[in-house]
């Protein structure tokens, strides 16, 4: 959705379809259509953001944000908004830190929400992470989720299995600075 009118229409349709009075978080899912990854939609994103601001001001959402936005994309919104994005949801996991974006978001008061903290399962068999996890008596998944949290982002792991969901919540431990440095060095 890359126009003000479509953004308004789809927000209203979403509210009707889910049957709720408000949504906790409403995002622009990407700065470009998925069929045109990397294309420049700056003007269109600014239009959509204006609709997002209105949606927020109406009380139909508690928070508004962006997803998969680069520093350039974020700055375009910041320079043309009355209300700054509250969240930037980005892919974030051990080996994929996106430090420039996370630092920029933090400096501008934007919460980074890290999706795929388990790298869509790819890091679950990583031996180095497994050794660190064993040291804390935790699973690789728990260390991976905790890592994202300690990097200052809100981890957003996906699971439909009750045991994994409970495990993803059970991250009340601290990874040492040395171990964070080891995890930072992984690719």
What are these regions (language model features)?
Residues 3-18, 72-74, 96-97:
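Short, acidic/polar
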């Amino acid at each position: 959705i890359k126009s003000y009118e479509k953004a308004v229409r789809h927000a209203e349709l979403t509210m009707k379809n889910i049957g709720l009075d408000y949504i906790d978080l409403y995002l622009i899912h990407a700065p470009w259509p998925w069929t045109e990854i990397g294309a420049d939609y700056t003007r269109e994103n600014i239009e959509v953001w204006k609709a997002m601001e209105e949606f927020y001001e109406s009380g139909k959402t508690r928070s508004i944000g962006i997803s998969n936005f680069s520093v350039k994309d974020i700055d375009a919104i910041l320079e043309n908004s009355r209300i700054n994005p509250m969240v930037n949801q980005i892919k974030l996991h051990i080996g994929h830190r996106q430090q420039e974006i996370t630092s920029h978001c933090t400096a501008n008061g934007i919460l980074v929400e890290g999706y795929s903290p388990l790298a869509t399962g790819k890091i679950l068999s990583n031996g180095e992470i497994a050794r660190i996890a064993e040291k804390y008596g935790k699973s690789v998944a728990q260390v991976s989720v905790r890592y994202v949290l300690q990097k200052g982002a809100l981890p957003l792991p996906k699971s439909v299995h009750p045991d994994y969901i409970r495990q993803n919540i059970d991250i009340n431990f601290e990874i040492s600075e040395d171990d964070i440095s080891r995890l930072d060095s992984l690719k």
